[in-house]
């Protein structure tokens, strides 16, 4: 299993605000969050209590364009959300956001888990060819900028 993790401290907002934003995000809000990089993010199919929601997202991470559907496979309100990536079939890839409130704001841990369990782990070295050091660096820089920018947006919405 390949794990790509970035921790970002964002002042002035809460974990609940981050999770709520992600659960209710529209294409317009996503594009405003990072114009030209965030292209689309919206819920296609909503489930009771949001577990199982199907979303579509389209964005650039560095020079790579990532277009996927994602299904919420885990949700802890105000704390954690996990999407499993889907591209025709469920992929062995998950995007996790873990949020923890602190005295001045929230710490967001952005984690991508890519790979197989059990016997499928033998295929992980092939995945590692796609997930090289350059992508790891781009993803880390991306998450740092992205969540600081989200903090600015959520603060602006709050102060209206």
Describe each PLM feature range:
Residues 38-44, 144-160:
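Short, highly charged C-terminal tails/helix-capping segments
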């Amino acid at each position: 299993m390949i794990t790509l993790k970035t921790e970002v401290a964002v002042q002035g907002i809460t974990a609940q605000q981050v999770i709520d934003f992600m659960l209710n995000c529209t294409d317009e809000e996503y594009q405003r969050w990072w114009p030209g990089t965030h292209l689309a993010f919206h819920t296609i199919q909503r489930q009771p209590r949001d577990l199982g929601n199907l979303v579509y997202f389209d964005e650039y991470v560095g020079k790579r364009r990532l277009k996927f559907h994602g299904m919420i496979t885990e949700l802890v309100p105000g704390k954690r959300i996990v999407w499993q990536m889907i591209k025709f079939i469920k992929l062995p890839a998950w995007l996790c956001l873990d949020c923890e409130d602190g005295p001045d704001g929230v710490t967001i841990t952005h984690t991508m888990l890519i790979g197989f369990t059990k016997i499928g782990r033998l295929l992980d070295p092939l995945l590692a060819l796609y997930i090289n050091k350059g992508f790891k660096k781009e993803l880390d820089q991306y998450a740092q900028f992205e969540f600081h920018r989200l903090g600015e947006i959520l603060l602006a919405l709050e102060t209206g």
